[in-house]
Amino acid sequence: MEEQVPMTAPGRWRALTTAALALLVSACATAPHDGASSAAADASRSAVQPALGVAAAPKVLPPAALPERAPDALDPLRPDTRIDLDSRGARTDLWARVRNGMAMPDLDDELVRKHERWYAGRPDYVQRMTERGARYLFYIVEEVDRRGMPMELALLPFIESAFNPQAVSSAKAAGMWQFMPATGRHFELQQNLFRDDRRNVLASTQAALDYLTRLFNMFGDWHLALAAYNWGEGNVQRAIKRNLAAGKPADYASLRMPDETRNYVPKLQAVKNIVLDPQAFGLTLIVLENHPYFVAVPIERDIDVALVSQLAGLPPEQFAQLNPQFNKPVILAAGTPQLLLPYDNANTFVKNLQRHPGPLASWTAWTVPRNLDPAA
């Protein structure tokens, strides 16, 4: 993404049902802050196979009780919204939901064909990319849906980073959505010694959708908005002015732009076409069920990353996949009010944290008072 100095703008909001769960850590933490038709889901399953290492979300039970069925889920960002995780709608194929929400005009040119062939010739790469994206895609789809945006945008991290939240470009763009440092700061993505929120799954997704909403409001065209996301809004504005001054069309296909930007929307169109009909390209997509992969667990005390992994029974590399923003081995609760954990590990973490007898952090940050004499 080209470095910009944007201002956020709210997207369109609409009602939805959502399926995330907030776990309340008694005495150790404070509270933080729909689906496609079954027919479409059944039709889509003929082109998918089970994901490797991506299990269906288990029920999360309160530590003090073991009822026969799990309680309704609670969204950590919208705690008044609940959904029955046992309902049929909660298990609808997420790919069907993505397909049903696609609304951008199609590109149909040789560049699209070129990228279709590239992906079709690399089934192992597509498999790895979709398995990685399985951790994050439900949350992104929920946010795109909530804002009433075209569902093609949920596929954009495939193009930006292959759904790798640790990705860093040669130009220093970072995270799943590839924010440049200055652009990230303008969207309040903190970048300091302890964390880089350009890699934060929740914060970077919110910032990216804010930015894309602003760009669409500026250009009135999703292809131009995407070009601006990649190349920079100022560059797109100047390219439009040049074409208009020369009496030429000012649509995406008619503008003069760098090769990377020229290929940007065709790449997204190729991924869209593959998601719509993977069998046509000799590909098979993994099954993605329409429910969350992770849960947000609130914390109020500093805690070591290694201790979180230990208490959650989660390998450190898996913790880092959901919480890639941390730069140091300690998590400062003042700047990080919640952690992301898979459902079953979140429940384990809550129980073990309540029983943990020792300190949570082996070291922490300390601000030197201005009046302290270092030589004293």
Q: What does each of the following model-derived ranges do?
A:
Residues 149-166, 225-231, 320-323:
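Short, functionally critical alpha-helical segments immediately adjacent to catalytic or ligand/cofactor-binding
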Residues 114-128, 163-170, 178-220, 240-255:
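Substrate-binding clefts and substrate-entry loops adjacent to catalytic sites
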Residues 322-356:
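Extracellular LysM carbohydrate-binding repeats and other cell-envelope/extracellular binding modules
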Residues 110, 114, 128, 132-135, ...:
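Extracytoplasmic/secreted proteins, especially bacterial periplasmic and envelope-associated proteins
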Residues 286-312, 316, 359-376:
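Primarily a LysM-type cell-wall glycan-binding module
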Residues 17-26:
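Bacterial N-terminal signal peptides
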Residues 3-17:
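Bacterial N-terminal signal peptides that target proteins for export
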Residues 28-148:
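An acidic, Gly/Ser/Thr/Pro-rich helix-cap/linker signature
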